[in-house]
Each structure stands twice: as C-alpha cells, then as structure tokens.
Regions:
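N-terminal beta1-alpha1-beta2 submodule of the flavodoxin-like/Rossmannoid cofactor-binding fold
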Residues: 1-74, 78-79, 103-104, 189, ...
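FMN-binding flavodoxin-like domain, especially the glycine-rich phosphate-binding loop
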Residues: 55-198
Length: 198
C-alpha cells in the first residue's frame, strides 16, 4: 500500500478539516507544515499540501516550496481553501501568484544573472496541480490584519451597485458580513481520486 503524507497550513480550521478528510480517504499521515519541515518525507509515495488562501496567496507555499525540492520525484498534489473559489478569475490569479509567477520570476532571474537554465525543481513546482475547496468565515473569530483585509474587501464589493456585482462577489460580501461555512467533504473527491490513481 502506498504511503501518503498530507500537510496543511491554515488559520481558522477549514484547511485542517479538509486535510483530515483527505487522510481518512487515503489512509495517509497528517502533518501541520511546522511538523512536516522536521520529518523525512522521502519515505512517502505521495505528498499532498494544502493551504488557506489569504489575500490571494496560499499560506505556507514558500515553506512548502523548500520541502518540494527534496520530494520532487514523488507524486505531489496541492489544494487551496478560500471563500471566493467559485470565481474562475480568482482561481487563475491564485495559480499564477503561487505557482506560475514564482517559477517565471525565478527563471528570468537565473537566466539573466547566471545565463543558465532554470533548476528542474522550479519548473516542476510551477506545474503542480491544485484543487480549490470552499472554506468558512466567522467574523467573530477574525482579528488583526485579517480583520482589516476583510474590511477592505467589504468596502470594495459593498461600494459597487448591486447590479454590477458578480454572483461570486455578492456571495463573498454576504459571507464577510454574516459569516459562512461552505466546508464540504465532497470537494475532496477529485483530489483523493488523483492520489489513489483512480
């Protein structure tokens, strides 16, 4: 039986819940990203990393990228958890920001500075598959910078006339104002099937 490691980085529990469900379905081992950086992942056949989406970035992606260099010969899958994942443009921007753009910037820098090809780990990282799962938002639990960011989101979307808001923007605004829990185990099916090779 193949060994699967599931690694997560989140703030409020949704990402961890998805990671636990993926572990259940794959008989995998669960690790927080903090734990994962301390262990030898080479003993695993497949590695799944999931992070919460925060201002377009996937939490922990930079740390995971360092881990990836050691496990790039394994089967690696990623997932991101957020409120606005129904918006195709938001998903595309998330992929570009966290995978493709990083790979592109590194490639340009390496080529310009050293006049050589980009390292294989960078190329592969830029092409990792990523699944998107809907998260939860509880205004009462949000503090600090997160509260400020969500206040800005509320102002930006709420400042538009209702007729000009997209459906996903309206749903996001309602979630920010009232809270929402979209966490649903059914989201993991395609990722689990990929890990199992189905």
């Amino acid at each position: 039986m193949e060994k699967v490691a599931v690694i997560y980085e989140g703030k409020y529990g949704s990402t961890e819940q998805y990671a636990k469900w993926i572990c259940e379905e794959t008989s995998g081992d669960l690790f927080s990203l903090e734990e994962a950086v301390k262990i030898d992942l080479a003993v695993y056949d497949a590695v799944v990393f999931g992070g919460a989406i925060h201002a377009g970035g996937i939490l922990g992606i930079d740390k995971f990228k360092k881990i990836f260099k050691k496990i790039m010969d394994k089967r690696v899958y990623t997932f991101a958890v957020g409120l606005n994942i129904d918006d195709e443009e938001a998903r595309k921007e998330c992929i570009e920001l966290n995978f493709e753009k990083q790979e592109y910037v590194v490639r340009k820098a390496v080529t310009w500075v050293f006049g050589r090809r980009i390292p294989e780990a960078e190329v592969r990282f830029g092409k990792l598959p990523c699944w998107f799962f809907k998260g939860a938002y509880d205004p009462a639990r949000i503090t600090g910078a997160d509260k400020t960011v969500m206040g800005v989101v509320k102002k930006m979307i709420g400042g538009k006339p209702r007729s000009e808001r997209t459906e996903s923007e309206q749903q996001l605004l309602e979630a920010v104002e009232n809270g929402a829990d979209y966490v649903d185990k059914s989201y993991i099916k395609d990722l689990v099937d990929a890990v199992k090779g189905i």
